[in-house]
Regions:
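Formylglycine-dependent sulfatase
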Residues: 1-353
Length: 354
């Protein structure tokens, strides 16, 4: 996957013929949209039409921005996309992707001099930046796009179901909260960034309510990994806060703090407010769960690692584990397996960054 996570370095990790969640829902009549970071690879081309399958500043300079991108959200089941190829404030290409093109190409090297300097400002690589790309306001741009989609959908297709995937930069390092959120907390820049994330979720929730979608919409809030090393170390020192507590480990580890994340669901009339489950689920399980909700029988070559947790959401699982086992992997490709309350790590230590 060299290049996939750090720029327009394709190919996409999802193979072209594999059934995806948005593709499945689109076939059931849903309008599908994604706004935010894609981060699983898409392919750009140079002026000779050759694919650029690597990352770095030199690769970004070789891109022919007049050509379409391949392997992005529009090729994997989404009707609409506006966002970035990978982490918008981390990786070498600092420009927005609109559909399958980059309408405003990067024109200059990122000047990181004016950016905030604090323990949470690392992970901002040198790269090329577009004139309309403000490193501190990307999440507000993503929010604006999602809100516009909901408003447009209400006006144009009020009776058509929709699937919206809002993929935030917050709270991935570097912690660059928007100008309206700086100083909002007494927990420093990272606390302010968390505040901004909370604001975004609130604005999306209010929009669902304002347009009359809230009572018939399943909302899921989650994350893709545990907290980053600098946030844990520095927040422990300065604010007595530990984003992984009580679990050991951080992002990229096989210890539980590396992969155990929040999972919050809101579905009025279906999910009991305030209910808590001790089920072990994986984000891959969303595919089988949504298939059950929309009455789709998944083919054998789709979502092989996905388990239906709809009974858990509805409070009908009676405590029975839905997963036979769950696999985990670190940045160094070290593996671990979990079955019930037992865990086996095929390595010494965390296997990752800790």
């Amino acid at each position: 996957y060299k290049g996939v996570f750090t720029g327009v370095g394709g190919p996409c990790l999802i193979t072209p013929n594999r059934l995806t969640l948005p593709d499945m829902l689109r076939k059931k009549g849903y309008e599908t949209a994604m706004f935010g970071k894609w981060h699983i690879g898409l392919t750009a081309f140079d002026k000779k039409g050759k694919p650029i399958n690597r990352n770095g500043l030199d690769a970004v300079r070789e891109i022919d921005y007049s050509r379409k991108l391949e392997g992005g959200p529009l090729d994997r089941g989404f009707d609409h996309f506006f966002g970035t190829a990978s982490c918008p404030t981390t990786d070498w290409l600092y420009a927005y992707v609109d559909g399958d093109r980059i309408p405003v190409p990067p024109t200059q090297i990122v000047d990181r001099g004016p950016l905030p300097k604090h323990p949470y400002s690392r992970d901002n690589r040198p790269g090329m930046i577009a004139p309309n790309f403000d490193l501190e306001e990307v999440d507000q741009v993503f929010l604006k796009k999602s809100l516009e989609f909901l408003e447009r959908h209400k006006k144009q297709k009020p009776d058509k179901p929709f699937f919206l995937f809002h993929s935030m930069q917050a709270v991935h390092l570097p912690s660059f909260p928007g100008k309206d959120f700086k100083g909002k907390t007494d927990s420093g820049p990272h606390g302010d960034f968390i505040f901004e994330m909370d604001h975004i979720v609130g604005e999306l929730t209010k929009a669902l309510e304002a347009h009359g979608f809230a009572d018939d919409t399943l909302v899921v809030f989650s994350s893709d990994n545990g907290p980053e090393v600098p946030t844990v170390i520095n927040m422990r020192k300065t604010h007595k806060h530990d984003g992984a507590r009580p679990w050991r480990g951080v992002k990229r580890d096989n210890w539980e703090g590396g992969h155990r994340v929040p999972f919050i669901a809101r579905w009025p009339g279906k999910v009991k407010a305030g209910a808590i489950s001790n089920q072990t689920i994986c984000l891959t399980d969303l595919m089988a769960t949504c298939a059950e909700i929309v009455d789709v029988k998944l083919p054998n070559d789709a979502a092989e690692d996905s388990y239906n947790f709809l009974p858990v959401l509805l409070g009908k699982d009676k405590g029975k584990q839905i997963r036979e086992y769950t696999l985990h992997q670190t940045i160094s490709l070290a593996m671990a397996i979990r079955r019930g309350s037992w865990k086996y790590l095929d390595h010494k230590g965390s296997g990752g960054s800790n």
